[in-house]
């Protein structure tokens, strides 16, 4: 029953706050504080910030001290009992505490001045008594909380040091170190240094001080940046090489068509001119054979052989050009529609030119109009190819440079390349095509297409 009585007894702080004199004084102070904030906006913002800070600190302190207060509840209850008894005696001696401020001021202005010192002394004593009790409780709470925190920190630090010093953690750390080192070596092997990086390496001066290795996170970020930069430079170089070789192919085709046209126009003029044209065609054949690694200057160069070889050159060049155009069409997924249209038109024109030379067995089967239209198509192809390649070079990011990627041959391409090595001749061997497959990350271009992978021709 005693415990029930203690638990049901109100807190001394609540009783003091509920006293009419204290509550009315609080109302006056609160109204003055609010009016001051309303009159001075800058002071209002500072006061609001202070209020939020006090509320936050109080909530944190209460949440942290609540378990300790619950443990010390019997002692706090005893202190509260003594404080309440003291407050009862004060209320008996000072009935003015039960009167509001306005009434006290109205009824006894003069008495207030005389009793000010006595009341101040009494209130100060009660406040000191309550404050000392609360201070003791808070100090005990702080000590208990601080001790618990220090013990927890020591246990956690000991556990972490034990885990980090264990053999398993050392094996994991060693494995991560080897993986990073191997990845950096592979990047340097398959993606060589760019010119800018070579210049930076040349400017570096090696000292004798040991340089501390950066953390794993810094090395991972540096590896990702290096991989993207070098892959972009390599892809850019390949695009430029494809552009240059395509232009060379078109130029060779243009020269071949001019030679065929010249031979057709002068076939009835004179045998000497025919012989000169045949010599030019034969030299073109020999030069082309040497460019692919074969030297057959001892072969016969009669008119029939010259015509067949010239047509073979034209067929091979148009086939290479057609392959390049088809590869280009498959590589520009996600680009603007006008670039798609130009690339598709390139493929159509390349197919038309290939059909012209594929179906012809001699110069006689090729009319002047057919040769003129072929030259016009070659000129249009050169312009369109320049536009598409310039767009690829000058508009980044390229959609094969997103996320972790690695070059690999697809199964169909691998089988096709192995079959081509066994069945095709050196004159008609096709360029190798590699696939660069990005991770399924969204790209600035790839988001418009369902397939984010693309191939880069290495020809």
UniProtKB/Swiss-Prot annotation:
Any one GO biological process: cellular response to glucose starvation
Changes after translation: Acylated; primarily with C14, C16 and C18 fatty acids. Phosphorylation at Tyr-232 by isoform 1 of CHKA (CHKalpha2) promotes dissociation from lipid droplets: dissociation is followed by recruitment of autophagosome machinery to lipid droplets and subsequent lipid droplet lipolysis.
Domain of life assignment: Eukaryota
Keyword terms, alphabetized: Acetylation, Lipid droplet, Membrane, Phosphoprotein, Ubl conjugation
Principal localisation: membrane
Membrane topology term: Peripheral membrane protein
Keyword Cell division carried by entry: no
N-acetylalanine modification, residue list: 2
Alphabetical list of InterPro entries matching this protein: Perilipin
Cellular component annotations (GO), alphabetically ordered: cytosol; intracellular anatomical structure; lipid droplet; membrane
Biased composition (Polar residues): 412-431, 444-459
Compartment list: Membrane; Lipid droplet
Modified residues (Phosphotyrosine): 232
Region span, Disordered: 412-459
Positions bearing Phosphoserine: 215
Listed SUPFAM superfamilies: Mannose-6-phosphate receptor binding protein 1 (Tip47), C-terminal domain (SSF109775)
Family to which this protein belongs: Belongs to the perilipin family.
Function: Structural component of lipid droplets, which is required for the formation and maintenance of lipid storage droplets.
Self-association and partners: Interacts with IRGC.
Name of this chain's protein: Perilipin-2
Species: Sus scrofa
């Amino acid at each position: 029953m005693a415990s029930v009585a203690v638990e049901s007894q109100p807190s001394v702080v609540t009783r003091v706050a509920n006293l009419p004199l204290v509550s009315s004084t609080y109302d006056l102070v609160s109204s003055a504080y609010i009016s001051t904030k309303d009159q001075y906006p800058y002071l209002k913002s500072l006061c609001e910030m202070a209020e939020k800070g006090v509320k936050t600190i109080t909530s944190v302190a209460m949440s942290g001290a609540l378990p300790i207060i619950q443990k010390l509840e019997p002692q706090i209850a005893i202190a509260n009992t003594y404080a309440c008894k003291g407050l009862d005696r004060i209320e008996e001696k000072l009935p003015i505490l039960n009167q509001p401020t306005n009434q006290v001021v109205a009824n006894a202005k003069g008495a207030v001045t005389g009793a000010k010192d006595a009341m101040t002394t009494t209130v100060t004593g009660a406040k000191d008594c309550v404050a000392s009790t609360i201070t003791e409780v808070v100090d005990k709470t702080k000590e208990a909380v601080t001790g618990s925190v220090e013990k927890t920190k020591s246990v956690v630090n000991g556990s972490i040091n034990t885990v980090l010093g264990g053999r398993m953690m050392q094996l994991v750390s060693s494995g991560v170190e080897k993986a990073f080192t191997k990845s950096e070596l592979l990047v340097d092997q398959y993606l060589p240094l760019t010119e800018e990086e070579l210049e930076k390496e040349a400017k570096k001066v090696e000292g004798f001080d040991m340089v501390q290795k950066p953390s794993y996170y810094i090395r991972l970020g540096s590896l990702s940046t290096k991989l993207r930069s070098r892959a972009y430079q390599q892809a850019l170089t390949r695009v430029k090489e494809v552009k240059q070789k395509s232009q060379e192919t078109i130029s060779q085709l243009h020269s071949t068509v001019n030679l065929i046209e010249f031979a057709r126009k002068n076939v009835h003029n004179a045998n000497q001119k025919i012989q000169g044209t045949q010599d030019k065609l034969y030299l073109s054949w020999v030069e082309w054979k040497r460019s692919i690694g074969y030297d057959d200057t001892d072969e016969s160069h009669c008119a029939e052989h010259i015509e067949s070889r010239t047509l073979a050159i034209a067929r091979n060049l148009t086939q290479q050009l057609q392959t390049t155009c088809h590869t280009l069409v498959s590589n520009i997924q996600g680009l603007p529609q006008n670039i798609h249209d130009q690339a598709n038109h390139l493929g159509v024109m390349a197919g038309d030119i290939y059909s012209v030379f594929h179906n012809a067995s001699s110069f006689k089967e090729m009319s002047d109009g057919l040769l003129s239209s072929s030259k016009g198509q070659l000129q249009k192809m050169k312009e369109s190819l320049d536009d598409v390649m310039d767009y690829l070079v000058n508009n980044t990011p390229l959609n094969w440079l997103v996320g972790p990627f690695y070059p690999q041959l697809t199964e169909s391409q691998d089988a096709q390349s192995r079959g081509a090595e066994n069945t095709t001749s050196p004159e008609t061997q096709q360029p190798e095509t590699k696939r660069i497959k990005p991770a399924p990350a969204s790209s600035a271009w790839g988001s418009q297409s369902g397939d984010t992978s693309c191939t880069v021709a290495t020809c």
